[in-house]
Amino acid sequence: MTGQLVQYGRHRQRRSYARISEVLELPNLIEIQTSSYQWFLDEGLREMFQDISPIEDFTGNLSLEFIDYSLGEPKYSVDECKERDVTYAAPLRVKVRLINKETGEVKEQDVFMGDFPLMTETGTFVINGAERVIVSQLVRSPSVYYSGKVDKNGKRGFTATVIPNRGAWLEYETDAKDVVYVRIDRTRKLPVTVLLRALGFGSDQEITELLGDNEYLSNTLEKDNTDSTEKALLEIYERLRPGEPPTVENAKSLLVSRFFDPKRYDLANVGRYKINKKLHIKNRLFNQRLAETLVDPETGEILAAEGTILDRRTLDRILPYLEKNIGFKTAKPMGGVVEGDVELQSIKIYAPESEGERVINVIGNANITRDVKHITPGDILASISYFFNLLYKVGDTDDIDHLGNRRLRSVGELLQNQFRIGLSRMERVVRERMSIQDTNAITPQALINIRPVIASIKEFFGSSQLSQFMDQTNPLAELTHKRRLSALGPGGLTRERAGFEVRDVHYSHYGRMCPIETPEGPNIGLINSLSSFAKVNEFGFIETPYRRVDPETGLVTGHVDYLTADEEDNYVVAQANMKLSDEGEFLSEDIVARFRGENIVTNRERIDYMDVSPKQVVSAATACIPFLENDDSNRALMGANMQRQAVPLMNPESPIVGTGMEYVSAKDSGAAVICKHPGVVERVEAREVWVRRYVEVDGQTVKGDLDRYKMQKFIRSNQGTCYNQRPIVSVGNEVVKGEILADGPSMELGELALGRNVLVGFMTWDGYNYEDAIIMSERLVKDDVYTSIHIEEYESEARDTKLGPEEITRDIPNVGEDALRNLDERGIIRVGAEVKDGDLLVGKVTPKGVTELTAEERLLHAIFGEKAREVRDTSLRVPHGGGGIILDVKVFNREDGDELPPGVNQLVRAYIVQKRKISEGDKMAGRHGNKGVISRILPEEDMPYLPDGTPIDIMLNPLGVPSRMNIGQVLELHLGMAARYLGIHIATPVFDGAREEDVWGTIEEAGMANDAKTILYDGRTGEPFDNRVSVGVMYMIKLAHMVDDKLHARSTGPYSLVTQQPLGGKAQFGGQRFGEMEVWALEAYGAAYTLQEILTVKSDDVVGRVKTYEAIVKGENVPEPGVPESFKVLIKELQSLGMDVKMMSSDDTEIEMRDTEDDDDHQSADKLNVEVETTKE
């Protein structure tokens, strides 16, 4: 036997074919959500309050400080919040201090700042009773970006942008005449020297000394028509504020507020880190030739002579001196924007490609500490210097699709940004109130208006593009949704503008973002999934783990480092499948490795790191596809996406051929019930499990508290599937922390179970599986193999209207006793009743105003003399296709203290459950992107059968394999058959699973034929088929696209107001559109009457369709069609353009067009006849 046995959870053993031992456990898969939110509660909120504190009034007399904050206990538990449709939130209280500087009076108060939504343990938020997920956003990191451009004459130039987290942009660019320009905040461009003069380097000589003499600088100085700091400031002011009278003071304060005011300009931690990294002098001198001798100013020791090339060794040696004191200069700008000296660090080097000894200055931004969050003059000078250096080929341009330049904004940061908006709006209100109110009687509570804060938080959770309704179809969908990375959303890209480069797979995605899992369609590449081992660091960059190789011994250690994409660029990384000795030494001299996106073969001495696992490349969903390495990537993408659409089945089954990811995915998804403390199971019921804790006391283990774990039973999920939890432990079991106590939906024995293992044959059968169609045995219907449970929620509310309140009642006008048989005395359906389309769920009547009666009604009243009842029937009925069994009814009353929206007195919710068996038209799929629709369900006796008499379950078309290149399904089929014979489950991890020889070995072990095929017999005749057929066990899932949801028919229904044509779509109960191509088809057949009928009485000939209905009811001939309404609309349109359009008949008489309204009750009596007949019934 090949492979080794591995235990997954308490109940499942699998034979694993993995050859590579796992060094690192998979991390908690929803950590990206939980840890980010925790950071927000612990630090993010505090940062926010520190940012705006203190708020001072315009005179500087009153000062309001935020000292501390605390979150209280939530009012309801998570389950109660879902039940009552409220938000799961805790009250936020802030301790505020108000200081009056004149009197020295200090007032402290605790101020309530609204309810703050809390994250549940599973990484979701409950907002208005619905579970939502905040998706992480991929954005460009704030930093300095340099990029090359080629103009229309083929001349190479450069552009650079300084992008802050928030604030004005600075852009540099060259033009065809080799002049360097700057744009401030997207305005018209100025020569870059104008900005330098404005910073206080007024004369040409100062600028030349600073940047070194070169032709680009002299061209720019020629173009620059200012010659002093004052003129430069006025020039910039005119560009930024055209039309206002410029003064030097205004110009200074404008530039200070644009760039040097921390409230207006913010680089954030990450921006400061990236800018220091890019502009620091040590990173720019690598491999350059010095044009000056470096001397230690303290000792006079020569560290590097002129002409030395600074390789990594030399650079490492002089690094401490670079950090400390070499090349530091203090520039003293005169009269510029910023007062005080500017620290710079400047070193001269020779330009790499100049034949002459051209000297260029490299200016670094000195050592700016991490807490300076705004840009400094030193940064601006260093960024300009880098730009000039780039023109002489010193330095690199940036690739903006590299993951070192894109970062994640997770929940915490998105919330923080939103909270900041609310707080700054509040700050404005506080300032205004400080100046208006009486200074003596003022209190913090009276100053603070919390409305803007609450509103901005509500807006974020309720309507932000990144706050999404959780995809709860199955546990995998839930897990993937929480790990999703979106490049869309506020501050991100838009679908229309995103080009190919952004969407493409980039080498830096390796181990960080899955190259396979992304939607098909307009969002491809913009929405991604986090790789299985990836983590997010404090700056929001995605890191992936690598095993360190000891540089001294060359052995691969067990030490794991998490590297960002930037850091990885400096190292050579070996693949996870390189063969190692037991000590960790590479067995071969030459190693296949990766370096900056190149695959290289290199000597083992050069290796710095090694991958931790073959599955670190792919995401959780992709890692659930066995034999992924044998599938074409396009099909693997479909396979990963379709697993998320699997409907939870009534009795699910985990795959015989799995990958070992099933257990981890199910456990971390949040669908299972997880044990929180070690202990022993005391009691197991359908609705709860009791665990008695074990506690350590003085080295003895004793029994402690009792934990009660509640199960969710038959709850409706967000997608209308059935969410149900079943215990899998027994009384007396000893459980550990983190163990699964109960399966959720689509789980079996603690493992993900999206579908069923069925017997599949690759063969055609009378053409019924043409074009990916699927033929299925009736056994799967009878035995409820693919039966799923669906729960739909319907609600009816009784409101206050102008004419009086609506009433929920059993007493409904014009409804017979038969229709009311399932309603209780309140008029609400009873639990357990079976309902069909159109049945009453909640009886409700609405008061009716006294309306004008029509002619018929007046006639009726004259004949029968009955008073019109002043209520109309607005009951809730079962919609089309919604029939089933009433699972539950919930009633909320204002009198009972339930929170209801304004104007609503009573709310009734009815839950209808449907049991859907698999049927023709349902969509099914395997895990390899092999999807199809069921075309025929054959009786069991007609299905082909194996030599031992077993009929097969499903027939797939063999032609679906070669062109799609997803060979994984064939390997899964054979291995699954062998595993079924051996009675085992199998784990074949991605990129490290069963090889071809393993599959054949297992087939042999199971005693199958050596071609793994079998003879099949035709169920109809009993004759064997001509050729041997591949038959085996494949894992097939039923997808959420079910024919019951899509089938729809209409006889009469609503019409559009303007065109009077039937509405479209199932939701509107619309008709089928007979489009222009269909019209051509009828024209081609010459079916004139059919065509006329379709264009008139079946659609928008208003009078005609009423008469046709009458004629059909009375059994007369259908009358001649009239003029369709849309034709009248066309004529009105032309008349509105001032054309005189008339309609003439064949004998040149004008046809009178009457509007439908003035068509006074055509033949009232006729109509009355019909009406009276229908009412009699």
Swiss-Prot record:
GO terms for cellular component: DNA-directed RNA polymerase complex. The keyword RNA-binding does not apply. The lineage of its organism: Bacteria, Bacillati, Bacillota, Bacilli, Bacillales. The RNAP catalytic core consists of 2 alpha, 1 beta, 1 beta' and 1 omega subunit. When a sigma factor is associated with the core the holoenzyme is formed, which can initiate transcription. Gene3D superfamilies: 2.40.50.100, 2.40.50.150, 3.90.1100.10, DNA-directed RNA polymerase, beta subunit, external 1 domain (2.30.150.10), DNA-directed RNA polymerase, subunit 2, domain 6 (2.40.270.10), RNA polymerase alpha subunit dimerisation domain (3.90.1800.10), RNA polymerase Rpb2, domain 2 (3.90.1110.10). DNA-dependent RNA polymerase catalyzes the transcription of DNA into RNA using the four ribonucleoside triphosphates as substrates. Keywords: DNA-directed RNA polymerase, Nucleotidyltransferase, Transcription, Transferase. Residues 1147-1177 are annotated as: Disordered. Its EC number is 2.7.7.6. The gene is rpoB. One of its GO terms (biological process) is DNA-templated transcription. It holds the Pfam family RNA_pol_Rpb2_45. It catalyses: RNA(n) + a ribonucleoside 5'-triphosphate = RNA(n+1) + diphosphate. Coiled coil: none annotated. GO terms for molecular function: DNA binding; DNA-directed RNA polymerase activity; ribonucleoside binding. InterPro entries: DNA-dir_RNA_pol_bsu_ext_1_sf (IPR042107), DNA-dir_RNA_pol_bsu_external_1 (IPR019462), DNA-dir_RNA_pol_su2 (IPR015712), DNA-dir_RNAP_su2_dom (IPR007120), DNA-dir_RNAP_su2_hyb_sf (IPR037033), RNA_pol_bsu_bac (IPR010243), RNA_pol_bsu_CS (IPR007121), RNA_pol_bsu_protrusion (IPR007644). It is an enzyme of class 2 (transferase). Residues 1162-1177 have a biased composition (Basic and acidic residues). Residues 1147-1161 have a biased composition (Acidic residues). This is DNA-directed RNA polymerase subunit beta. Belongs to the RNA polymerase beta chain family.
